[in-house]
Regions:
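Bacterial N-terminal signal peptides
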Residues: 8-16
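An acidic-aromatic substrate-binding cleft motif
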Residues: 100-150
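Non-catalytic, glycine-rich low-complexity segments
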Residues: 23-51, 103-107, 111
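Bacterial Sec-dependent signal peptides at the C-terminal "C-region" and cleavage site
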Residues: 15-24
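Short, conserved helix/loop micro-motifs enriched in His/Cys and acidic residues
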Residues: 141-167
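Single conserved hydrophobic/aromatic residue that forms the stacking wall/gate
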Residues: 168-176
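Extended acidic/polar, glycine-enriched regions
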Residues: 53-112
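Positively charged n-region of N-terminal signal peptides that target proteins for export
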Residues: 1-4
């Protein structure tokens, strides 16, 4: 019985160790389809992979490779680019590949506030006109961060990028 228990502990520990060695290639939720990256500034990208894994990032003809550190964290920087898009951001590891589509380079604004930041366009006095015009602004994007409490800094945010469109300006947006 003692040998069987020791064997199970050994198998468990080996499983934990091998899982740490083969981490999944990943990036925080802020990197996603429909994102906007700041134009005319160095573009910083980061995530995690297996320790010491080579990670290659590609965007709009630029390509750079970095190596994850011993804990699997990696950081890559692309040179500044002019406004434009849509592009596809490709991130490749040894065995995995991430692709983020409909990526724009432009102005990034960070807005924060209280309940007034959750005001929906359909409640505005000129809502019909603004909603009708919304399809003309597909280059406008928003990343709505889900409310979350934490007593320490977070390495990821829960949320998603949205294209300015009828869905985002309608009652359906209130169902989030």
């Amino acid at each position: 019985m003692k040998k069987a228990f020791s064997f199970l502990i050994l198998v468990f520990l080996c499983g934990m160790f091998s899982a740490r060695l083969s981490a999944e290639l990943s990036m925080p939720h802020i990197f996603a389809d429909h994102m906007v990256l700041q134009r005319n500034e160095a573009i910083n990208l980061w995530g995690s992979a297996s320790p010491k894994e080579k990670v290659t990032v590609e965007l709009n003809g630029q390509k750079t490779s970095v190596r994850a550190d011993a804990s699997g964290k990696w950081n890559a920087t692309l040179r500044p680019m002019e406004a434009g898009g849509p592009y596809t951001l490709i991130v490749k590891g040894k065995k995995e590949r991430l692709a983020f589509d409909d990526v724009l380079l432009g102005e990034v604004w960070i807005c924060s506030g209280q309940s007034n930041m959750e005001f929906r366009l359909h409640a505005a006095m000129n809502a019909e006109k603004e909603i009708a015009d919304a399809e003309n602004y597909s280059f406008l994007r928003s990343f709505n961060v889900k409310q979350e409490m934490s007593h320490r800094p977070l390495s990821d945010l829960q949320g998603e990028w949205r294209v300015c469109c009828l869905l985002y300006t309608s009652d359906a947006a209130d169902e989030e």
